[in-house]
C-alpha cells in the first residue's frame, strides 16, 4: 500500500491534530494513534478486510519489536523531551488500542463516537479523557476501565491460544 498509507495518515491529521489538537505533548497519542489507525481503515476500505488486518498486524509488530515499549504508558505525563512521545507506543500501540475499541463497541458506535469527539472539541484542544466521554455518551457504557488500562497504563494484551484437534479439524 506504500504511499497510500502515508497519505491516509497525513489526511487524518486534518481532523485529529488540526480540527482538534492535542491539549499537550503528553496527549499527542490522540492525534497520532488515529492517524496511524487510518492506515488500517484505508487498507480495509480500498482493498478489503484481509489487507486491513495485514496493515494492523504490521503496525502491531512495529510496537512489539520496540525495546522498552511495553513499559511505557500511552498517555505519558512525564517525559524528558517532547520528541520522546513520537514513538511506536504513541503511533502503533495507540492504533491497536483503537482497533480493540472498535471491536469492543462495534463499527456504528465507534464511528459515531469519533464524530461526537470531533464535533464537541472542534477548534479546541482535546485529550484522551474527552475521547472517553464521547464514547460513553454514544455507547451508554462506563469506559473508565478501558481508558485506565489502555490509555493510562502500560503493557500489552497477553493472548493464550489453545487448539483442540478432533478428527483432523481445529
Model-derived regions, located:
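Hydrophobic alpha-helical and helix-loop surface patches within well-folded domains
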Residues: 1-170
Amino acid at each position: 500500500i506504500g504511499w497510500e498509507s502515508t497519505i491516509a495518515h497525513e489526511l487524518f491529521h486534518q481532523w485529529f491534530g488540526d480540527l482538534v489538537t492535542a491539549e499537550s505533548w503528553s496527549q499527542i497519542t490522540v492525534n497520532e494513534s488515529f492517524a496511524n489507525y487510518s492506515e488500517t481503515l484505508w487498507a480495509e476500505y480500498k482493498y478489503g478486510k484481509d489487507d486491513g488486518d495485514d496493515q494492523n498486524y504490521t503496525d502491531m509488530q512495529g510496537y512489539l519489536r520496540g525495546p522498552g515499549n511495553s513499559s511505557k504508558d500511552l498517555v505519558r505525563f512525564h517525559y524528558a523531551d517532547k520528541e520522546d512521545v513520537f514513538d511506536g507506543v504513541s503511533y502503533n500501540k495507540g492504533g491497536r488500542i483503537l482497533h480493540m475499541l472498535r471491536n469492543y463497541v462495534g463499527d456504528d458506535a465507534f464511528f459515531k463516537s469519533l464524530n461526537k469527539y470531533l464535533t464537541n472539541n472542534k477548534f479546541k484542544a482535546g485529550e484522551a479523557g474527552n475521547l472517553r466521554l464521547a464514547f460513553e455518551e454514544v455507547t451508554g457504557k462506563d469506559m473508565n476501565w478501558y481508558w485506565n488500562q489502555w490509555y493510562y497504563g502500560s503493557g500489552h494484551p497477553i493472548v493464550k491460544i489453545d487448539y483442540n484437534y478432533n478428527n483432523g479439524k481445529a
